[in-house]
Amino acid sequence: MIKFRLNGKIFELENDISVYDFLAQNGYELKFIALERDGEILPKKLWHEHFMSEAKDYEIVTLVGGG
């Protein structure tokens, strides 16, 4: 079992899943977010090859337009 925290909420998964697949399956609009893993931004080009990891802290950062 894989256990990690995303935006303060604990998730437990039975199987490995890529960052990309996890975010897509949970309804996030991938075009407009960034993902921070343990305090560092994980580049989108790596989302397919990196998996949600045990005991990691993730934060989703959204882009906000202004003017």
Language model features with spans:
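Ubiquitin-like/PB1-type beta-grasp interaction modules and other compact soluble beta-rich domains
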Residues: M1-G66
